[in-house]
Design a protein with these regions (language model features):
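Accessory nucleic-acid engagement/destabilization modules that flank
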Residues: 1-19
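N-terminal pre-P-loop "Q-motif" helix
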Residues: 39-74
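Hydrophobic anchor at the beta1->P-loop junction of P-loop NTPases
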Residues: 78
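Conserved lysine of the Walker
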Residues: 86
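Conserved helicase/translocase motor-coupling segment
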Residues: 90, 242-245, 274-453, 457-459
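Conserved RecA-like ASCE ATPase "motif II neighborhood" in helicase/translocase motors
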Residues: 133-223, 431-435
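Signature of the SF2 helicase/ATPase Hel1-core->accessory helical subdomain module
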Residues: 182-290, 459
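C-terminal accessory regions
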Residues: 227-230, 432-538
């Protein structure tokens, strides 16, 4: 039983000097060529991504279709450093397996809207030149919003018995045509509490305490109804950024505790372990404990091909994600060593206390890059710049930047990422800063990250202090009961500091002597810490 796939991504003679495209450009290239030509970066970066894609298509899917008399089910976890290309793996596999009903799901609304808008703009622009096969593939079949897919499950397949807390398959149910589902940012899937929270759906049964499923439970229940299926989880370590995000262990807990899923096979790499991937809420078992259970049940396969080891986003060095990790862990010595020995000559990180200097530096670097005619040796018509800040950065308003809520700004996000620099809503205009919820999974070429008093370096204790703003003053987010919230706040900066491909500016404001909510001492410790790492002050 052979799965016929588009083998376009298995190329020979990769150009070792050509870097990766941005995710948006990569998606466009998939669309135009109906394969992944043009995604090259070379050397280890290209190799690890291609091995992951090939392993999923050639090994995971084929073994699953042979298992249990053609009714096998599998789940596959793809891990990697921030910017390693996990989302790109998902897009490539989705396109390659369109004939068996593959689709990529994402609960990241901005990412779905930006990629969908980019592909639709491309279709309108190049429709006559695009391959016939491309025109036959709808944008929506490649990538879908997770919310819409869950709604389809309720409307067409799942019959929930109100008051009983049980489910069954609807009479004359329309089973999913998707045999391969790729779930982006699987660590952000909803827990049960968020699934039943009022306002998440117009369906009354979603708001009932007895509803039995978390988001992983619902999606795996649905695929279990098909004759065969592969569920691919793309996992970003330490990137849960919102309440109600279950963490990756919820997928493993569901597989272990649900009797109907006991025959599912599990694929993962040996790197899928440790604090960065384990859930931070303290509930349930660790990944290591689940691995032991699955091994004893003879339903676990470990493959090195499922971990992406090199960062493609920072295409001048894969060490930037390591640097950010050490920075957030307050390991100054390790940061200095990394920056001076591995990063400084390839990827510039500037530090300033003046937002206007940051904007000027972004424009200067953009002009320099365009004048050279390439980004890391790749011809590029566009260098994307933009302003970023955390969703807790409440006191950037005096500098001209307000927190954007997704409900109020989501329709503008595609324009921010895609419009030209003569449009005021474009990122290049540098008037609007987006936060971690809008940019996770996407990237810029050059970014300015504005660092507010929500995350402050404590010089005395060599640790971070966390604060929320309540319109009058900053209140501490304490250890203990609020530890999960603290991890979300740190993860927000991890996301922001790993968005830029060729360089960034970190802005720590001076503060104000006449505004206690922006007092200089709220910022000085953070600035001093970052300066001690050897970043170039401008």
């Amino acid at each position: 039983m052979e799965t016929v796939v588009n083998r376009g991504f298995r190329r020979e003679g990769v150009n070792e000097t050509c870097p990766c495209d941005t995710l948006i450009d990569a998606a466009r290239n998939v669309w135009r060529s109906n394969n992944v030509a043009g995604f090259t970066k070379g050397e280890a970066e290209e190799a690890t991504r291609l091995m992951a894609e090939d392993y999923i298509v050639s090994t995971v899917v084929e073994e699953t279709r042979q298992r249990n008399g053609g009714r096998g089910k599998s789940i596959c976890f793809v891990t990697g450093v921030p910017g390693a290309g996990k989302t790109l793996v998902g897009l490539n596999v989705s396109v390659a397996l369109q004939n068996v009903g593959a689709s990529m799901l994402s609960g990241n609304g901005p990412l779905v809207s930006v990629l969908t808008a980019a592909l639709k703009r491309d279709l309108n622009k190049y429709k006559k030149q695009l391959k016939t096969a491309t025109n036959e593939i709808s944008v929506e079949s490649i990538i879908r919003g997770a919310y819409g897919y869950k709604k389809e499950i309720f409307e067409k397949r799942l019959d929930y018995h109100v008051g009983e807390g049980t489910v069954s398959l609807k009479d004359n149910a329309e089973l999913s045509s998707q045999h391969v589902l790729i779930f982006d940012e699987a660590q952000r899937a909803w827990n049960k509490a968020k699934m039943i929270r009022p306002g998440q759906s117009g369906k009354k049964y979603w708001q009932e305490e007895k509803f039995p499923f978390s988001e992983p439970g619902l999606l795996l229940w649905d695929m279990n109804q098909c004759d065969w299926g592969v569920f691919v989880c793309l996992v970003g370590g330490g990137q849960e950024i919102h309440t109600g995000e279950a963490g990756i262990c919820e997928w493993l807990r569901t597989l272990e505790e649900t009797p109907e899923l006991r025959d599912w096979h599990v694929y993962m790499s040996d790197e899928f372990k440790g604090e960065v991937y384990n859930s931070k809420d303290g509930s349930g078992k660790t990944i290591e404990e689940y691995r032991t259970i699955f091994e004893a049940q003879n339903r676990l396969t470990i493959s090195k091909d499922l971990h992406l080891t090199a960062c493609q986003r920072s295409n001048r060095t894969e060490k930037v994600s390591d640097f950010v990790e050490q920075l957030l862990n307050c390991n100054a010595d390790a940061c200095r060593t990394l920056y001076n020995n591995e990063i400084k000559g390839k990827y510039k990180i500037y530090l300033t206390r003046d937002v206007e200097k940051a904007k000027a530096k972004l424009r200067e670097r953009k002009a320099e890059t365009l004048n050279k005619g390439f980004v890391d040796g790749q011809n590029d018509e566009e260098v994307r710049i933009g302003m970023l800040m955390s969703s807790k950065a409440a006191r950037m308003r005096p500098l001209g930047y307000e927190i954007k809520k997704e409900s109020q700004y989501k329709d503008k996000v595609p324009s921010w990422f895609l419009d030209s620099d003569d449009t005021v809503v474009s990122s290049d205009f540098l008037e609007i800063a987006l936060n971690e919820f809008f940019v996770q999974g996407l990237e810029l070429d050059l970014a300015a990250v504005m660092w507010d008093a929500d995350l402050r370096y404590n010089e005395q204790n060599n640790e971070w202090d966390y604060f929320d703003f309540n319109d009058r003053y900053w209140s501490a987010v304490d250890k203990g009961e609020q530890e999960l919230k603290r991890s979300y706040m740190k993860n927000a900066y991890r996301v922001l500091l790993t968005r830029a491909r060729i360089g960034m500016v970190i802005v720590v404001p001076y503060g104000s002597q006449v505004d206690k909510t922006r007092a200089p001492e709220l910022y000085d410790g953070t600035y001093n810490y970052l300066k001690s790492l050897g970043l170039e002050d401008i």
